[in-house]
């Protein structure tokens, strides 16, 4: 290895001082920060507030200081159907309810993976990966689908938010600590020669402790509840006592198995028009993990537009922090000129595939597509997005995505499989999925707070 010499430093300093633009950039950046100094005013003006195709949603939701964006996005697609079916002004499903069961199922998933890797070295990559974040808040559509098929949904009034659902950090920290100690006990007991049957008895007791911790933090999830909905004209639209599973079946009108995950990963190890899954990624054991069909970006746009034109919102996952004006709610590759600020390629140094390969980008956040604009030739130009950061964020709680930003940073959408071509549908339903490593970027979990 070669160290940095003082001659190297002197040369770098001379290079900096040789261009007045560097000094101007330094003065702006040290005062305002990188993103504000790189902000392009025209980036805001390029994003109008009207849309050619648009679905109308209820009041904006707020995940607060939790990583439940994937749950909020999923529930926002559900509540849209409820609002439309019963002619409601607005409505909200409980986000604390699926959080409870997700933590319960992830804990079980983690301990099952520990039992399945007893012969793996503790300091090996696989076990180290499993121990890194056993029950984080993040997730994907297939994981949410598994939760709903097993546990249903409830109105927010049936299981309201708590301090720990609004801010999951402390609960997650203590549950993670407990699960890591449980993993230690299971591995050490196995090393001592105990049978798998004995280990499973230990795990059963551990899961009772997990349940106790979750009820303490989130409250008891309802087994049944009364629900009454009034429409915009104050007429009683729904009244009765339901289980969570009955409430989903009665109000949402959605076959969960019809909605599938489409990804767009242009890396060499993932040829397009094939199916993929991720090893050891999931939550509900009987849910079967995740399954994707990998298509090119133009196909993701075609599918999303088709569903929006049928007046249905679209769940999607993206790398939200890239080229993002958070206060204005604008995601646009023209919004920030970081390369111009520094005078060399930074944001433009890697293409979409290279960013995935070199760890620069992956899916970090899930939201909902609510609308789209087209140019004179029918090409998409701008997308309306329902976020879950409250009404004071962005433009009254919604964001916009430029079409070039979609090209670069949208990685996953969820659509009704009826919009696929016959060839695409056959591939998704019949092809044996290629198994990706647990740490593959397509296994990232939408979790941004």
List PLM regions with ranges:
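Conserved catalytic-core surface of thiol
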Residues: 375-449
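Long, positively charged binding patches that form subdomain-scale interaction surfaces
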Residues: 289-364
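Active-site nucleophile-adjacent alpha helix/oxyanion-hole segment immediately C-terminal to the catalytic cysteine
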Residues: 44-314, 393-396, 403, 411
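Catalytic nucleophile-His microenvironment captured as a short glycine-rich beta-strand/loop
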Residues: 69, 148, 357-390
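Short, glycine-/Ser/Thr-/acidic-enriched flexible segments
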Residues: 76, 321-323, 372-374, 390, ...
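N-terminal regions that are enriched for targeting/export leaders
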Residues: 2-58
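Generic recognition of flexible, low-complexity loop/linker segments
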Residues: 290-292, 300-306, 354-359, 368-375, ...
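Short His-Asn-centered micro-motif
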Residues: 72, 316-319, 370
């Amino acid at each position: 290895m070669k160290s940095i010499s003082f001659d190297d430093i002197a040369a770098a300093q001379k290079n900096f001082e040789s261009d007045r633009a560097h000094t101007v950039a330094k003065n702006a950046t040290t005062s305002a920060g990188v993103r504000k100094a790189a902000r392009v005013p025209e980036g805001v003006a390029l994003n109008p507030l009207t849309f050619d195709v648009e679905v109308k949603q209820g009041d904006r939701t707020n995940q607060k200081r939790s990583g439940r964006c994937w749950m909020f996005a999923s529930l926002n697609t559900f509540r849209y159907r409820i609002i439309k079916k019963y002619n409601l002004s607005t409505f909200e499903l409980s986000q604390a309810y699926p959080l409870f069961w997700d933590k319960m199922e992830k804990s079980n998933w983690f301990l099952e993976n520990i039992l399945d890797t007893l012969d793996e070295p503790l300091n090996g990559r696989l076990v180290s990966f499993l121990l890194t974040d056993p029950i984080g808040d993040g997730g994907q559509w297939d994981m949410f689908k598994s939760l709903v098929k097993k546990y249903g949904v409830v109105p927010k009034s049936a299981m309201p938010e708590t301090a720990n659902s609004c801010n999951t950090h402390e609960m997650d920290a203590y549950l993670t600590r407990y699960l890591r100690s449980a993993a230690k006990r299971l591995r050490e007991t196995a090393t001592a020669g105990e049978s798998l049957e004995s280990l499973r008895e230990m795990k059963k007791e551990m899961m009772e402790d997990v349940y106790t911790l979750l009820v303490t933090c989130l409250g008891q999830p309802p087994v049944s509840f009364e629900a009454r909905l009034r429409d915009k004209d104050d007429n009683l639209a729904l009244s009765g006592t339901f289980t969570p599973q009955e409430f989903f079946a009665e109000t949402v009108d959605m076959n969960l198995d019809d909605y599938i995950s489409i990804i767009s990963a242009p890396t060499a190890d993932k040829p397009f028009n094939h199916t993929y899954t991720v090893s050891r990624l999931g939550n509900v054991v009987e849910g079967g993990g995740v399954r994707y069909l990998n298509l090119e970006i133009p196909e993701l746009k075609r599918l999303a537009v088709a569903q929006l034109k049928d007046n249905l919102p679209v769940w999607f996952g993206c790398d939200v922090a890239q080229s993002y004006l958070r206060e204005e709610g604008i995601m646009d590759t023209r919004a920030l000129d970081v390369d111009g600020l520094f005078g060399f390629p930074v944001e433009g140094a890697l293409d979409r595939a290279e960013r995935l390969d070199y760890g620069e980008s992956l899916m970090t956040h899930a939201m909902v597509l609510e609308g789209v604009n087209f140019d004179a030739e029918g090409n998409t130009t701008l997308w309306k997005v329902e976020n879950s950061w409250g009404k004071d964020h962005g433009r009254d709680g919604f964001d916009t995505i430029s079409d070039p930003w979609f090209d670069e940073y949208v990685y996953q959408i969820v659509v009704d499989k009826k919009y696929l071509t016959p060839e695409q549908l056959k591939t998704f339903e019949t092809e044996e999925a290629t198994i990706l490593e647990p740490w593959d970027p397509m296994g990232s979990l939408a979790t941004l707070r």
